[in-house]
């Protein structure tokens, strides 16, 4: 079904305003990477909270220079207040102590470090942390637990990546950001497509069918292949969903022990 994106923008702005107010806050903070998702969230926050929406730019030693440039251009274009904190000195210390660390470990460290900066800023400024993960990432578990997945409110968490692209066009996000390959910018050469094996234009239709057909039920891979999806695609995506499902759950706490 074709979305009315102007109505969606109004809905998300209303959602942000009401949820932040409900939690007793007037200000928000979020990480701005120069990528699509954070740009969309940034512009939505700016529409609602104006000068009370603050962006943190947190480049690492592996961040591409154009990521920072794109983030700064967005801030200038939409009058977004921002602060820059380089996390490069900290990720270099991690690299010094863990020389054999995989790229995934390094990336997770940077993601959690950024969230530490965001929550420290939120305490200092009495602001609420806003999330920037889309539904495609959340379903796939393509994010860092207690890193980029951590937040108090997420306005785009129910939008698939392809929907975020369309929303971005209606928000007048710069074409430079729209046209760049999706990337978490966690290490040199990293991209979502390389990590996931497929572009979102291929993944999202499958994710939508999985949600529609198997919400709260075991995924039937054979039924998906009968719909025409490639068998290897189905296997890879469903495996990732099942493996990372725990990332969307609250911690499991043992029930109170009552001895007989």
Swiss-Prot record:
CDD domains: NAD_synthase. ATP binds at residues 31-38, 132, 161, 183. GO terms for biological process: NAD biosynthetic process. One of its GO terms (cellular component) is cytoplasm. Pfam families: NAD_synthase. Mg(2+) binds at residues 37, 137. Deamido-NAD(+) binds at residue 112. Its EC number is 6.3.1.5. It catalyses: deamido-NAD(+) + NH4(+) + ATP = AMP + diphosphate + NAD(+) + H(+). Pathway: Cofactor biosynthesis; NAD(+) biosynthesis; NAD(+) from deamido-NAD(+) (ammonia route): step 1/1. The keyword Ligase applies. SUPFAM superfamilies: Adenine nucleotide alpha hydrolases-like (SSF52402). Disulfide bonds: none annotated. GO terms for molecular function: ATP binding; glutaminase activity; metal ion binding; NAD+ synthase (glutamine-hydrolyzing) activity; NAD+ synthase activity. Keywords: ATP-binding, Ligase, Magnesium, Metal-binding, NAD, Nucleotide-binding. It comes from the Bacteria. Catalyzes the ATP-dependent amidation of deamido-NAD to form NAD. Uses ammonia as a nitrogen source. Homodimer. Belongs to the NAD synthetase family. This is NH(3)-dependent NAD(+) synthetase. It comes from Helicobacter pylori (strain P12). The gene is nadE.
């Amino acid at each position: 079904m074709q979305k009315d994106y102007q109505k969606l923008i109004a809905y998300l702005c209303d959602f942000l305003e009401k949820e932040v107010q409900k939690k007793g806050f007037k200000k928000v903070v979020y990480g701005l990477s120069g990528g699509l998702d954070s740009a969309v969230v940034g512009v939505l926050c700016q529409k609602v909270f104006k000068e009370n929406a603050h962006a943190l730019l947190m480049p690492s030693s592996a961040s591409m220079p154009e990521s920072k440039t794109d983030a700064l251009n967005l801030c200038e274009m939409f009058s977004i207040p921002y602060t820059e904190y380089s996390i490069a000195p900290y990720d270099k210390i991690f690299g010094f102590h863990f020389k054999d660390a995989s790229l995934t470990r390094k990336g997770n460290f940077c993601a959690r470090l950024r969230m530490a900066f965001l929550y420290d800023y939120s305490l200092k400024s009495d602001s609420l942390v806003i999330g920037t993960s889309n539904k495609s990432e959340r379903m796939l578990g393509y994010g860092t637990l207690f890193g980029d997945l951590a937040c108090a409110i997420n306005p785009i968490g129910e939008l698939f990546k392809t929907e975020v692209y369309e929303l971005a066009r209606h928000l007048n996000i710069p074409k430079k950001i729209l046209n760049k390959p999706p990337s978490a910018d966690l290490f040199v050469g990293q991209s979502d497509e390389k990590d996931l094996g497929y572009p979102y234009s291929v993944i999202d239709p499958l994710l939508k069918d999985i949600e529609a057909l198997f919400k709260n039920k075991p995924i039937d891979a054979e039924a998906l292949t009968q719909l025409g999806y490639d068998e290897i695609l189905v296997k890879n995506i469903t495996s990732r969903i099942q493996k990372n499902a725990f990332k969307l759950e609250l911690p499991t706490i043992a029930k109170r022990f009552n001895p007989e």
